[in-house]
């Protein structure tokens, strides 16, 4: 699937539900926001309500909660691609999460690859629905160098 990637070192993650995705990604997102990186979440479904619920229950200071909620958690890819384009032009460091079914991830990655071809300051994290790809997880992991877990980014061995 991602063997044709040319410019980005990619990471994968696997989730069982929207809340699970958010629990896996939030520590990493929080770290990247602390590093002043732009965080963009391209998602097949709207996560606005689930992230609000989760953020209200986690132990973070209010400023960090506000920063997390400022991220666009809705499924409006067109607006997010406009934002990616702006960030590329201004040479911002960014982390892009791509969350959804395997076909969605493949299509979004093809577009991201074209748009960010010459940009070296982009990190992409593909987040797969475990229910959909459970039989193919090993093959998918073979295409990545890292996996994202709640403990952070780990090298796949």
Language model segments and positions:
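Non-catalytic regulatory/interaction regions at protein termini and inter-domain linkers
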Residues: 1-157
């Amino acid at each position: 699937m991602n063997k044709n990637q040319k410019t980005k070192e990619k990471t994968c993650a696997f989730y069982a539900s929207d809340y699970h995705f958010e629990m896996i990604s939030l520590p990493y997102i929080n770290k990247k926001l602390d590093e002043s990186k732009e965080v963009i979440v391209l998602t097949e479904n709207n996560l606005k309500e689930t992230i609000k619920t989760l953020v209200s229950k986690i132990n973070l200071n209010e400023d960090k909660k506000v920063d997390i909620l400022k991220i666009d958690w809705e499924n409006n890819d067109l607006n997010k691609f406009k934002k990616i384009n702006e960030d590329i032009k201004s040479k911002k460091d960014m982390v892009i999460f791509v969350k959804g079914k395997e076909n969605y991830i493949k299509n979004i990655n093809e577009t991201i690859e074209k748009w960010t071809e010459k940009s070296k300051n982009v990190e992409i994290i593909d987040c797969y629905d475990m229910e959909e790809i459970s039989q193919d997880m090993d093959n998918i992991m073979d295409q990545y160098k890292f996996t994202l877990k709640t403990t952070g980014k780990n090298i796949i061995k």
